[in-house]
C-alpha cells in the first residue's frame, strides 16, 4: 500500500494532473489504485457544467499513472520519465461522475527494452467503467 506522498515520490505529476490517490496493492507485474472523483476536479468546470462527467481521456491518464507508479517505484527506473506510445482496444462502458471511486488495475503483459505494454481497467462499484491496452516508452 502507498499513500499520496509515496505516489508523489514515484510520479512527476502534480495538481491538477495527479490522478492517483492511493495504491491498494502491488506486485511485480500488477497494481491496484484508487482515484476519488470529487466535484472539485477542475475538469468538471467545462465537462459538463450541467452534467459533470469525467473525460474518458483522463480515465485513461489515471490508468497510465497507476501503471507508472509501479514501474517508477523500481530502483532501476527512479528519476525516469514514461510517455504514452499508444492505446489500443480502449472502451468506455460507464460514465464516471462526482462521488465515484475509480478502482484502477494495471497489469504488465510485455516488457522489451524501453517499451512496456499494459492491460488496464477502471471500475466503479465493481462495474467496468473503462479498459484498454496501453503502450509506454521510457525516457532517460
Swiss-Prot record:
**Which Gene Ontology terms cover its molecular function?**
(3R)-hydroxyacyl-[acyl-carrier-protein] dehydratase activity
Which keywords has UniProt assigned to this entry? Cytoplasm, Lipid A biosynthesis, Lipid biosynthesis, Lipid metabolism, Lyase
What's the superkingdom here?
Answer: Bacteria
Write down the EC number.
Answer: 4.2.1.59
Give GO BP annotations, semicolon-separated. fatty acid biosynthetic process; lipid A biosynthetic process
Catalytic activity entry: a (3R)-hydroxyacyl-[ACP] = a (2E)-enoyl-[ACP] + H2O
Q: Name one GO cellular component term.
A: membrane
Q: Where in the cell is it found?
A: Cytoplasm
**Main location group:** cytoplasm
**Where is the catalytic site?**
47
InterPro entries xrefs = FabA_FabZ, FabZ, HotDog_dom_sf
PANTHER family of this UniProt entry? 3-HYDROXYACYL-[ACYL-CARRIER-PROTEIN] DEHYDRATASE
Q: What does this protein do?
A: Involved in unsaturated fatty acids biosynthesis. Catalyzes the dehydration of short chain beta-hydroxyacyl-ACPs and long chain saturated and unsaturated beta-hydroxyacyl-ACPs.
Similarity remark: Belongs to the thioester dehydratase family. FabZ subfamily.
Put simply, this protein is called: 3-hydroxyacyl-[acyl-carrier-protein] dehydratase FabZ
Q: Which organism is this entry from?
A: Streptococcus equi subsp. zooepidemicus (strain MGCS10565)
For this protein's source organism, the top of the classification is: Bacteria, Bacillati, Bacillota, Bacilli, Lactobacillales
